């Protein structure tokens, strides 16, 4: 529930679950540009946080990627994952999984509004606009598994 709680606190603080609105309020520069191999990227240049989002994404994909990149700012500020991947043997996959989970929590910060008993995970995934695995992580976060 740690990541869900962080998302809920952020939504309550800014009065919205829209990640782009929150990023602008925080002072994160956002650029929407066409990219071929990336959906989005977060970086900090000269202490200025910056997010680039692939402009070729659907609205649903864009909202998820915005929340995913916001997660890197909220949860992983100061971690240079690209550097770690290229120069060390440290595994950084957990940063991406955490960012995916945070993005799902931003899409549905109040579980009672989106969870229906007995509903297949794929239905939840489709409603949130996330992959099956991310919907499973969300359920594990909500139910503490």
Where are these regions (language model features)?
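Active-site hotspot residues in diverse enzymes, especially metal/ion-binding acidic/histidine motifs
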Residues: 1-145
């Amino acid at each position: 529930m740690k990541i869900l709680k962080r998302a809920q606190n952020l939504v309550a603080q800014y009065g919205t679950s829209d990640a782009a609105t929150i990023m602008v309020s925080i002072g994160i520069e956002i650029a929407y540009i066409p990219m071929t191999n990336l959906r989005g990227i977060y970086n900090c240049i000269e202490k200025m946080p910056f997010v680039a989002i692939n402009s070729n994404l659907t609205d649903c994909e864009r909202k998820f990627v915005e929340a995913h990149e916001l997660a890197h700012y909220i949860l992983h500020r100061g971690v240079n994952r690209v550097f770690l991947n290229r120069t060390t043997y440290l595994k950084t996959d957990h940063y991406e999984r955490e960012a995916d989970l945070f993005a799902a929590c931003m899409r549905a910060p109040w579980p009672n509004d989106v969870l229906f008993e007995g509903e297949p995970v794929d239905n939840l995934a489709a409603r949130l606009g996330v992959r099956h695995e991310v919907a499973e992580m969300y359920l594990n976060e909500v139910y503490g598994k």
